[in-house]
Amino acid sequence: WFASKGIQVDSVSVPVLESAIATYYVIALSEASSNLARFDGIRYGLREDPGKGYDELYCATRSAGFGREVKRRIITGNYVLSHHLSGDCYESALRVRARMEKEVGTVLQQYDFIFCPTAPTPAFKIGERVNDPLAMYLSDLFTTFVNLSHIPALSIPAGKAQDGRPIG
């Protein structure tokens, strides 16, 4: 179709993109846990009954104020930033992001845009992956590099699967 419209399409390879999902989640979850730490129920955010002390207040507030996935992301982000990893994981991810931004920028100096699907599979059925966070995270395969590279993106519907779920 593109060739019939006079549009040249080439395949490009950006090897650093293989690290996009891991890089994205290390950065995103680390920053989310850091930013959400201020929602302690004392100075910011929802305030639950303090119970007997500050520990109980924090626990009650965060239990009521954050959903399951948010809690999972906060805990994972805290682990990444923990003294056990000494911040090395986060610092490495920032370096990979900088390299990714540079490599994607080099491609965009030669081409007008990068064309790829938004998701590797048709849309999930509602509630289908709720208990499989890894599958949900992996569905971001083609969008994480866009966020990390600080470039705009557009998702265009590309049809429907046999069962009617959107592809795009």
What role is predicted for each listed range?
Residues 8-9, 20-21, 28, 38, ...:
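Glycine-rich, small-residue loops and helix-cap segments
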Residues 1-9:
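Short helix-loop-beta junction
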